[in-house]
């Protein structure tokens, strides 16, 4: 990937930020110190080393493959690419639900069976794979690893999870992936929120200064980022089932209801449907 720093350099940035070193990483990952030092000097990691590093560093293995500049192994890819189209609506609805109902949705997702992966004859165009360096890394983790696939889905999801702080035109994600626009601190913070990666970690990896734009702590956004990740193992039909179950929890919003007390989701036949804000 053109303009992409070697993995050893990115790993060193992260370790420096965390104020730890190769000796600690060797102990935590089970990878010999000598191999890690070679990696830091520019030797690419093996697939098994990526697995060990992911566990030690607290990253999803699929994400660390992308950070390392490698294709994600098929076994770590989402179950069905077509499932991505239903994820935005699911996140939109579940964010509005009170905590107990959100917990039910999480449990529903957790207990759905793992079905065989589907490989369509005409897979979606992988616009996010390119030679855009760190921008391609961010967009690939969001669109491919979280199964959002399209830039429109990515734009809507980031808008939801950042509570409107970040809304980019869909075409901008293509520019980010291609490396034709520089990464902005607000963008890196927004990606961190949607990816469920600590913003400071992502800033260290990308070499971004977040001192003036540190994203606020948002437990609900972190919870939705986790849901987005968990849904990657589901087929489109399963996501439709979960979304229907979530929508069935919505109730008519009273006409005189305050926005401070109710979350509104969609308007149908003169009535707003949503949920009371109970936490």
Show where each model-derived region lies.
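A short, Lys/Arg-rich alpha-helix, primarily the initiator
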Residues: 1-21, 107, 114-157
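Residues in the helix-turn-helix
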Residues: 24, 35, 63, 172, ...
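DNA major-groove recognition helix of helix-turn-helix/homeodomain DNA-binding modules
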Residues: 49-63, 184-201
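Residue-level signal for the short linker/turn that defines the boundary of a DNA-recognition helix
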Residues: 5, 9, 19-20, 45-48, ...
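Interfacial/linker helices and their anchor residues that mediate assembly or domain coupling
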Residues: 73-130, 210-279
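Short alpha-helical "recognition helix" segments of helix-turn-helix
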Residues: 24-26, 53, 151-161, 191
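Recognition helix of helix-turn-helix/homeodomain-like DNA-binding domains
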Residues: 30-45, 54, 69-70, 159-183, ...
């Amino acid at each position: 990937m053109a303009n992409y720093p070697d993995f050893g350099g990115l790993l060193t940035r992260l370790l420096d930020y965390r104020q730890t070193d190769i000796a600690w990483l060797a102990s935590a990952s089970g990878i010999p110190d000598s191999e890690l030092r070679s990696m830091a000097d520019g030797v690419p990691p093996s697939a098994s080393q990526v697995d060990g590093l992911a566990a030690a560093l607290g990253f999803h293995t699929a994400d660390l493959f992308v950070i390392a500049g490698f294709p994600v192994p098929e076994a770590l890819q989402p179950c069905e690419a077509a499932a991505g189209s239903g994820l935005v609506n699911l996140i939109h609805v579940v964010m509005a639900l009170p905590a107990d109902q959100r917990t039910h949705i999480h449990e529903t997702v957790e207990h759905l069976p793992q079905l065989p992966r589907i490989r369509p004859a005409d897979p979606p165009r992988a616009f996010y794979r390119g030679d855009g360096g760190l921008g391609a890394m961010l967009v690939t983790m969001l669109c491919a690893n979280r199964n959002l696939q399209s830039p429109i889905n990515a734009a809507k999801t980031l808008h939801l999870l950042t509570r409107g702080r970040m809304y980019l035109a869909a075409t901008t994600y293509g520019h980010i992936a291609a490396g034709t626009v520089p990464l902005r601190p607000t963008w890196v913070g927004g990606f961190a929120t949607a990816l469920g990666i600590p913003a400071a970690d992502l800033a260290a990896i990308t070499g971004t200064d977040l001192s003036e734009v540190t994203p606020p702590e948002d437990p609900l956004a972190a919870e939705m980022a986790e849901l987005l990740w968990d849904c990657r193992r589901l087929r489109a039909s399963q996501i439709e089932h979960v979304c229907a179950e979530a929508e069935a929890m919505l109730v008519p919003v009273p006409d005189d209801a305050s926005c401070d007390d109710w979350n509104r989701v969609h308007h149908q036949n003169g009535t707003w449907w949503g949920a009371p804000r109970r936490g």
